């Protein structure tokens, strides 16, 4: 096992512990608490994968951080903070929408890279909006917290979430997963739109009809799907 992988996990465990103390003292806001809960599940998954005890890793992580802080001068810390861009937390969904439980009549689940895609295949001919909570850096999506698909009535019919045992994903991973979710929902004649906020930070542009810009590969796939549907309709007639 790579030593850097172990030390990274140990430091992450200790930093999570510090953030938990912040929440216990009622100093954290809603996004802070949301990230804390999700990181806790991620750490459990990583600990299981690495075969490491979280409590023991936290103690070692504390020693690593204390050693770094002891050697770090105040001036170096100021320079580091000044040169490091701060990420922002973007919220399309309310806390209620983010935490609400939902159920599927015809569940379908697919893993796309480090992301898990879930959708209800029973949903047909609905207008659906994709909304997400995520962090942004340099005006680009950095980390997806959670994406959900909502009908006009407010029902949740789809979701994209990071895999707890597979930490880390890129903006391309997110866009690919969104493409898969849209394709799955549109197969049942649903009309899918993406929130302007998500369009802006994931694609850097906003489409008037609410759809994300499609790659040539996605356009070819949609064309093949449309041709197949036409053939099926003709056979049915």
Curated annotation (Swiss-Prot):
Q: Which domain of life is it from?
A: Viruses
Q: Enumerate the Gene Ontology biological process terms.
A: symbiont-mediated suppression of host cytoplasmic pattern recognition receptor signaling pathway via inhibition of RIG-I activity; symbiont-mediated suppression of host gene expression; symbiont-mediated suppression of host mRNA processing; symbiont-mediated suppression of host PKR/eIFalpha signaling; symbiont-mediated suppression of host type I interferon-mediated signaling pathway
Q: Where in the cell is it found?
A: Host nucleus; Host cytoplasm
The keyword S-adenosyl-L-methionine appears for this protein: no
Motif Nuclear localization signal is found at: 34-38
Q: Name one GO cellular component term.
A: host cell cytoplasm
Q: Which UniProt keywords apply?
A: Eukaryotic host gene expression shutoff by virus, Host cytoplasm, Host gene expression shutoff by virus, Host mRNA suppression by virus, Host nucleus, Host-virus interaction, Inhibition of host innate immune response by virus, Inhibition of host interferon signaling pathway by virus, Inhibition of host PKR by virus, Inhibition of host pre-mRNA processing by virus, Inhibition of host RIG-I by virus, Inhibition of host RLR pathway by virus, Interferon antiviral system evasion, RNA-binding, Ubl conjugation, Viral immunoevasion
Instruction: List the residue ranges of the region (Disordered).
Output: 205-237
Report the residue ranges where the short sequence motif Nuclear export signal is annotated in this entry. Answer: 137-146
Q: Where is this region: RNA-binding and homodimerization?
A: 1-73
PTMs per UniProt? Upon interferon induction, ISGylated via host HERC5; this results in the impairment of NS1 interaction with RNA targets due to its inability to form homodimers and to interact with host EIF2AK2/PKR.
Q: Where is this region: PABPN1-binding?
A: 223-230
Q: Where is the stretch described as CPSF4-binding?
A: 180-215
Query: Where do Basic residues bias regions lie?
Result: 217-237
Keyword RNA-binding part of the UniProt annotation:
yes
Q: Which GO terms describe its molecular function?
A: protein serine/threonine kinase inhibitor activity; RNA binding
Q: How does it assemble?
A: Homodimer. Interacts with host TRIM25 (via coiled coil); this interaction specifically inhibits TRIM25 multimerization and TRIM25-mediated RIGI CARD ubiquitination. Interacts with human EIF2AK2/PKR, CPSF4, IVNS1ABP and PABPN1.
**What function does this protein fulfil?**
Inhibits post-transcriptional processing of cellular pre-mRNA, by binding and inhibiting two cellular proteins that are required for the 3'-end processing of cellular pre-mRNAs: the 30 kDa cleavage and polyadenylation specificity factor/CPSF4 and the poly(A)-binding protein 2/PABPN1. In turn, unprocessed 3' end pre-mRNAs accumulate in the host nucleus and are no longer exported to the cytoplasm. Cellular protein synthesis is thereby shut off very early after virus infection.
**Note on domains (UniProt):** The dsRNA-binding region is required for suppression of RNA silencing.
Similarity comment: Belongs to the influenza A viruses NS1 family.
* Identification of the protein by name: Non-structural protein 1
- Which organism was this protein described from? Influenza A virus (strain A/Alaska/6/1977 H3N2)
């Amino acid at each position: 096992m790579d030593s850097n992988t172990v030390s990274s996990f140990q430091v992450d465990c200790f930093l999570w512990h510090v953030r938990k103390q912040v929440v216990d003292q009622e100093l954290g806001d809603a996004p802070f608490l949301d990230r804390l809960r999700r990181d806790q599940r991620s750490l459990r998954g990583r600990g299981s994968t690495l075969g490491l005890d979280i409590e023991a890793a936290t103690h070692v992580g504390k020693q690593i951080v204390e050693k770094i802080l002891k050697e770090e001068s105040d001036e170096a810390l100021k320079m580091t903070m000044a040169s490091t861009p701060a990420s922002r937390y973007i919220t399309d969904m309310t806390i209620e929408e983010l935490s609400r439980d939902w159920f599927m009549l015809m569940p379908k689940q697919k893993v796309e890279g480090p992301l898990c895609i879930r959708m209800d295949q029973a949903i047909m001919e609905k207008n659906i909006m994709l909304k997400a909570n995520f962090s942004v850096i340099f005006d680009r999506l950095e980390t997806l917290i959670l994406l959900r698909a909502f009908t006009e009535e407010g029902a949740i019919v789809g979701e994209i979430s990071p895999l707890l045992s597979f930490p880390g994903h890129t903006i391309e991973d997110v866009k690919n997963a969104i493409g898969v979710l849209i394709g799955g929902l549109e197969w049942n004649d649903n009309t899918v739109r993406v929130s302007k906020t998500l369009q802006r930070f994931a694609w850097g542009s906003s489409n008037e009809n609410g759809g994300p810009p499609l790659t040539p590969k996605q356009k070819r796939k949609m064309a093949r799907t449309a041709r197949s549907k036409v053939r099926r309709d003709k056979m049915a007639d």
